[in-house]
Amino acid sequence: MTKKLAALIWLRFKLFTVNKSILFEIVSPFIFAYFYKYLYSLQKISTQNSDFLGFLIPFSLSIGISIPIIAILSEEQEKNSLSALMLSGVHYFEYLISLAIVSLFFALCIIIIIPLILNSKVSILNFNYFFSSTFMAISVCLISLIAGLLAKTQVIGQVISLPVVAITSFLPMLATINNTCKAIVNYSFISLFYKYIQEPNLALGNNSKSLVIVLLWIALLITITYLIIQIYRKDLFNYDWH
């Protein structure tokens, strides 16, 4: 299984880097970061504070990670590539985990490089920042896997990706100006990252409520993914039987 998984990971990595549209989606967060930095410099506004990261990191993850995952899964389902892989002996676990691993690799690139582009005061070695943003990236990845599995065609995938991107990108920003949005964020998968942005010097131990909320979200998303996989396995079995 290890060799098969390693081969799938390599194939996924090649797909991310060879497909021009997917590669552009991955690179676009860094382009946006440079653009915003230039735009703010014209207005003599600093991009070094953590508040700016509070918008740009979720936005970058939704554009650079969420959209490619949904696009890949929806395209493979439309072309019945998933069924072909299952019939050839590839397990659902291997299929999804390979996509998740490659996606999280690029997510970590976003988490590390974006603060460097912005000359942010937030150090990439800051445990609170790295921990909270990584947990958010895992949640975004799982949500995207679920959305991609539910999309039977590329058109449906594009439609589903819009609310996923909108919620991930703009909810943290709206939380700063609207109490209802703030309450939603406090109980969402963005909760821990949002708390860090609000209080960068606060230890994670004092954010135990947000940590528990994020862990519950991850557990819920993994459970939903598992249930969808079980349904697909049943459908594939019925297809073979007939």
Residue ranges and their predicted role:
Residues 92, 100-152:
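Alpha-helical transmembrane segments and their short interhelical loops
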Residues 21, 54, 62-67, 97-98, ...:
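Short alpha-helical transmembrane interface motifs in multi-pass membrane proteins
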Residues 15-42, 52-68, 160-172, 213-224:
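Hydrophobic alpha-helical transmembrane segments of multi-pass membrane transport/permease proteins
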Residues 215-242:
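Junction motif at the cytosolic side of a transmembrane helix
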